[in-house]
A protein has these predicted regions:
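Acceptor/aglycone-binding surface of glycosyltransferases and processive sugar-polymer synthases
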Residues: 1-75, 113-120
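Terminal low-complexity segments of carbohydrate-biosynthetic enzymes
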Residues: 72, 98, 127-146
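Residues at helix-coil transition
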Residues: 51-55, 96, 138
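A general structural signal for well-ordered alpha-helical segments in protein cores
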Residues: 42-47, 87-91, 101, 129-130
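Catalytic donor-sugar/metal-binding loop of nucleotide-sugar-dependent glycosyltransferases
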Residues: 56-57, 78-82, 91-109
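Post-His helix in hydrolase/transferase enzymes
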Residues: 120-128
């Protein structure tokens, strides 16, 4: 089970799926936080790109929140990755093994304190996206070959 920001019951830093979030409310929530509106927008776009590359219905491939029975996971699924791209690998391994992967909504609140490691700059966002894209293309090839 994946915690997803992009399905019913989930939300993302000012944008709540179960409410009628106005653009004004979203911008206000982000302005009163330590989050970048650009990072939020790019995250949504990036998840859609990953979804397209992988031809999957999973909507939040950068969530990082996953729960399941221990027997379905191995340490190799989490080792040897640069940042959060392990999550794409884990989800695709589970799907390749014909396991039922479901998403449940969770709300990622706007950051009130501290700085994001991910969105400190546009360059960093772009640099961190490369390993995700690499593992997505590799996973797609593995799924097509099986």
């Amino acid at each position: 089970m994946i915690g997803s920001r992009f399905i019913e019951g989930g939300g993302y830093k000012g944008l709540e799926k179960n409410t009628k979030s106005t653009l004004k409310n979203i911008i206000n929530n982000l302005n009163n936080s330590e989050d970048s509106a650009l990072a939020v927008y790019l995250s949504i776009l990036f998840n859609n790109l990953l979804k397209f590359i992988l031809s999957t219905n999973i909507r939040d491939l950068t969530s990082g929140f996953i729960v399941g029975k221990k027997r379905f996971f191995s340490s190799e699924m989490f080792n040897g990755f640069e940042y959060g791209e392990y999550f794409v690998f884990v989800v695709m391994k589970l799907l390749k093994n014909n396991l039922n992967v479901r998403e449940v909504g969770y709300y990622c609140k706007p950051r009130k304190f501290g700085k994001s490691k991910t969105s400190s700059s546009l360059f960093r966002l772009i640099r961190l996206s490369y390993p995700y894209l690499k593992i997505a293309y590799k996973s797609r090839k593995e799924l097509n070959d099986s």
